[in-house]
Amino acid sequence: MHPITIYQEEIKNYIRTDFELELLNDTCSFSEGPVWNKEGYYLFSDIPNNIIGKIIPGKPKEVYLQKSGCSNVEEAELPRMMGSNGLAYDADKNLFICQHGNHAIAKYDGKTLVPFITSYQNKKLNSPNDIVVAKDGSIFFSDPPYGLKDQKISPEKYQSRAGFYC
């Protein structure tokens, strides 16, 4: 029995279809942003717990980075969704992190977490969500109001619209 339904046979020319799904982790309340590290493990954001988890196939989940989306939990304006979300690596193995609580994109080199993009036109970002690093190093990310109070745009503090940036 195949684990997915195939509607167009042509898809087999582009993706593997001979696989079985495997549950790697079920201990998170809301996880997002999975990314594969070439050293042989997965990272993912556990948003409400404000951590990035690490899964090495065949081993239990471990914490890779704490305070991944919000560095000052006491002052978080997004208490339920303050953690990181989207994750992406660049060619130099830096991890770029969408930070809901800090309203920013951070850069992590494996030792130091630093703010990378903190605002646009002198206003904080809303709630950076998904991120991709292109071959040339360009960074693309989305910035919807997810996590903001009632998921509403708040132009006096943050961006006046949900945006997509490069």
How should each PLM-predicted stretch be described?
Residues M1-C166:
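Sequence-structural signature of mature extracellular/luminal beta-sheet repeat domains
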